[in-house]
Amino acid sequence: MAQCSDLPEMAKAYEAAEVEKKWYQYWMEKSYFKPNPNSDKKPFVIIMPPPNVTGELHLGHALTATLEDIMIRWHRMQGEPTLWLPGVDHAGIAAQVVVERELAKQGKTRQQLGRELFLEKMWEWVNPCREKIRHQHMRLGASCDWDRETFTLDAGPVKAVREIFTNLYEKGLIYKGERIINWCPRCGTAVSDLEVDHKDLAGHIWHLRYPLEDGSGFVTVATTRPETMQGDTAVAIHPDDTRYAGMVGKNVVLPIMNRRIPVIADEAVDMAFGTGAVKVTPAHDPNDFEMGLRHNLPMITIQNRDTTMNENAGPCSGMTAKACREYVVSEMKSLGLLLRIEDYIHSVGHCQRCSAVIEPMVSKQWFVKMEPLAKPALEAVNSGRIQILPERFNKVYQNWMENIRDWCISRQLWWGHRIPVWYCPCGEMIVAKVDPTVCPKCGGTELEQDPDVLDTWFSSGLWPHSTLGWPDQTEDLKRFYPGTVMETAYDIIFFWVARMIVMGMEDMNEVPFRTVYLHGLIRDDKGEKMSKTKGNVIDPLKVIDQYGTDALRFAVTFGTSPGNDSKLGQTKLEAARNFANKLWNASRFVIMNLGEAKELTPEAELPLEDRWIISRMNRVTADVTRLMEEFQFGEAQRVLQDFIWGEFCDWYIELAKVRLRDEASVSPRPVLVRVLSSILRLLHPYMPFITEELWSYLRPYLPESLRETDIIVAPYPAADKTCFDEQAESVMGSLVEIVRSLRNLRAEHNVEISRYIQANIYAGDMASVLGNYLGAVETLSRARPVNILPGHYSGASTATEVVLVLTGIEVVVPMSTMVDLEVEAKRVKAEISELEIQIERLSTRLSDEQFLAKAPQAVVDKERIKLEGYIEKVSRLKSA
């Protein structure tokens, strides 16, 4: 990297692509992304939520990466050793489905290839994807420690997974049993709740009559799935439902199967649904399964894994589910037991990966007993050892933990962490951390490993400590566990955040992180969810190519707050790009006007605007620091942008220009450097590339303590309250208000840019102070002459003058200096005439009975509002 004094003259326009490549490579070479080993401060640690290896990063990833990088850069600038550990998730079913689709294009299946060859194909596909994701994160400016990058199928995580599986099994917390799971018939595996998309579909409710065994009548049940009737093992009613008084304890005869089943009472029954009586099929409905456990009901599975009906379905054996439904409905009708059919909209689960309808099914799988593990994880949050932001998600977390169910961790896939269980022909089952070679029971060597793999979330739950070397007691684990912040989207609090807390408490007896920061979703500029089908998806890499990384980062975080969704469209992206350009142009102006490279010392007695901008800079620094500490990054960004653009650029630099042209005045250069230095450092976490580039040009003018420091590790500004100057802020506030009001007045009356207006400013006690800035007022508002007078003006606006009433100040502007009064009078007369025509037209229309009867109320209301506006405007024009 060239010496600062050797840097070429600044380009007129900011060239993002060139700058980004240069600085990222430089930061890597300088090892700035690694935690400082010499610091004795407490480390700040974020373990990156590992994106799925399946594809390119989307805007959600861009938001995650930007928010985390903001935190990392901010803490790095405070001298803390920072570790941002990156990684990628193997993505289980999501990745396997992609590769299987590629094989299908070649007319092949994984079964034809065999497990070993298929896994080779998986690795061939995965490795380039990992590199691509890494490169994309680099383009986002992510200052991760890439030497610590981890993949969930690396040797370390594999060792950790086997360790925790074995430990939990030995404690009796992992077991193999039959429970209800989500079964995808197309993917051929159990899937997690997260991998099920629920869609509202048009269906029916069938009202079916089940005869009482004693012949005294019928119980009519309402169901949306008559095809599962053969698996019914009870009819349930609510205990408080008086319609079925005396029914509990009786039996009904299950039609078609002629099997006796009991009538039971359970509070889970919704009395308002259908008839208030429901069929209970424990093997094919999650709620029925729980009810079956409560009442010790038999669980009869009537479907095969391909969703065809099995031998337990009686006459429907071998049928598809659809054919079975048609058979049952037809048979019930012929038996006189079909009472009626109603249309109904209900939620149906679909596989997120292949869109097949999910079948709830009792299946033999591996499960984790969650209740004993959930207790310490719940206490960790309730006691405040872990803070969840925003706080409203504490209740969500608590509710989920208190009602937690056993977790199905086995998947009928080939890609993933294979379950560390082996079976011997002698019947022995071996659970081991390392591959066994001999059966401990019979000494046999023909051991076969369980074919299933673990749920992706199982290995992800170990992420905060497996990435640091656990189960080995590494130096990284000692130094960086627990992490500081876990930043992720609010929609995976159950599936990932909760499980990380569970696993951390179990493995480490310590929380995995101190704070959980949950961000919202990014929606389009209309507030709609982005999707490929809607065509409203924004590709972050294309945005970077068009606007630059800093603009993307600034846009995705602007207006964000913990847990709330935000909008993003071209308008916001262009605004972010414009802000970057504004920053570049303002900084370039400052740097180009600093003269010879040297440390600039401000005068002992500073002019008002210098004291004002220094005071404002320190207040903004205090506000931004507080907001950053509170994780209000979007609000901190807004405060910062308002100050940079609305105060430093629009006002201070404009005032400084006047002094730069006057060699006799106090030089604004030292203050320009001081403020710009703070601005760049405050902004660096949000816009790292442009700030580092501008800093490189500013460095020759900085104090010696900063001159040899890159901004990425420069000290973050600290607010100096002794610089707060309320008087300067008050006076400058009045000056800004005067100029802004005169500018607005010019705009309202379309005053030509070349034309000067006149103004008398009645400033009371502030007249003498403001009088020192007469030239600035005239220049900035294009008003001349301007008279600043003591006292106050009590008159009101007339046809010949406009009176602007400001805070303790009145500004009087003669109309003749803004417009030609004769021409203006003709224009007003013509406008009144046109408005009166419109008033007559609307009055006639709103008196028309037919119009009022036929037109929508919204249209009528709109016309009335329009009429009232025209009448008010005519009144205003006539009184002017």
From Swiss-Prot:
Pfam families: Anticodon_1 (PF08264), tRNA-synt_1 (PF00133), Val_tRNA-synt_C (PF10458). A motif ('HIGH' region) lies at residues 51-61. It comes from the Bacteria. Catalyzes the attachment of valine to tRNA(Val). As ValRS can inadvertently accommodate and process structurally similar amino acids such as threonine, to avoid such errors, it has a 'posttransfer' editing activity that hydrolyzes mischarged Thr-tRNA(Val) in a tRNA-dependent manner. Its EC number is 6.1.1.9. It catalyses: tRNA(Val) + L-valine + ATP = L-valyl-tRNA(Val) + AMP + diphosphate. One of its GO terms (biological process) is valyl-tRNA aminoacylation. Keywords: Aminoacyl-tRNA synthetase, ATP-binding, Coiled coil, Cytoplasm, Ligase, Nucleotide-binding, Protein biosynthesis. GO terms for molecular function: aminoacyl-tRNA deacylase activity; ATP binding; valine-tRNA ligase activity. It is found in: Cytoplasm. Its main location: cytoplasm. Monomer. A motif ('KMSKS' region) lies at residues 529-533. Transmembrane segments: none annotated. Belongs to the class-I aminoacyl-tRNA synthetase family. ValS type 1 subfamily. It comes from Dehalococcoides mccartyi (strain CBDB1). It is an enzyme of class 6 (ligase). InterPro entries: aa-tRNA-synth_I_CS, aa-tRNA-synth_Ia, Anticodon_Ia_Val, M/V/L/I-tRNA-synth_anticd-bd, Rossmann-like_a/b/a_fold, tRNA-bd_arm, tRNAsynth_Ia_anticodon-bd, Val-tRNA_synth_C_sf. ATP binds at residue 532. ValRS has two distinct active sites: one for aminoacylation and one for editing. The misactivated threonine is translocated from the active site to the editing site. The C-terminal coiled-coil domain is crucial for aminoacylation activity. GO terms for cellular component: cytosol. This is Valine--tRNA ligase. Residues 815-854 form a coiled coil.
